[in-house]
């Protein structure tokens, strides 16, 4: 357990997780539009797969029993590498040029890039909530989800308008 003065750091980390995860989803949608278009039959499954992977991340994070900060740091580093390499325009273009039909390329992109990102980042809130044991469970998770969702909102808004 961290001292009470570390709470702002924990909330900053879950804010970054939220910003990064929804930001990655927005960037992924922008990257696949040239290959698949922007209709609801593209965006809805992308959002759905992302949410499913996020749910699996929450489930995985809930089972973590120790090494909380080391695991979150590792997940952030892997997610950063996946974001940098996997969401780069050249990578997406290569996936869609090399794999046919486009639906299969889309599924490979989702399975290899966006879903692993969501799964890794989704573990953050349940893992870091363990470090807030001095609070009521509802209070700790409520504040963590508040900061994560605020980050998600700002990540989706800033990266979609930018």
PLM segments and residue spans:
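Alpha-helical transmembrane segments of multi-pass membrane proteins
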Residues: 1-162
């Amino acid at each position: 357990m961290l001292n009470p003065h570390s709470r702002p750091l924990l909330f900053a980390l879950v804010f970054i997780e939220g910003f990064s995860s929804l930001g990655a989803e927005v960037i992924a949608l922008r990257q696949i539009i040239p290959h698949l278009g922007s209709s609801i039959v593209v965006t809805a499954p992308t959002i759905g797969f992302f949410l499913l992977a996020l749910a699996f991340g929450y489930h995985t994070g809930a089972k973590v029993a120790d090494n909380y900060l080391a695991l979150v740091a590792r997940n952030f580093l892997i997610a950063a590498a996946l974001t940098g390499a996997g969401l780069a325009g050249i990578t997406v273009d290569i996936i869609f040029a090399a794999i046919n039909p486009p639906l299969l390329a889309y599924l490979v992109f989702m399975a290899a890039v966006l879903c692993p990102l969501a799964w890794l980042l989704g573990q953050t809130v349940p893992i870091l909530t363990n470090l807030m044991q001095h609070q009521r469970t509802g209070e700790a998770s409520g504040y963590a989800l508040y900061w994560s969702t605020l980050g998600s909102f700002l990540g989706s808004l800033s990266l979609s308008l930018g």
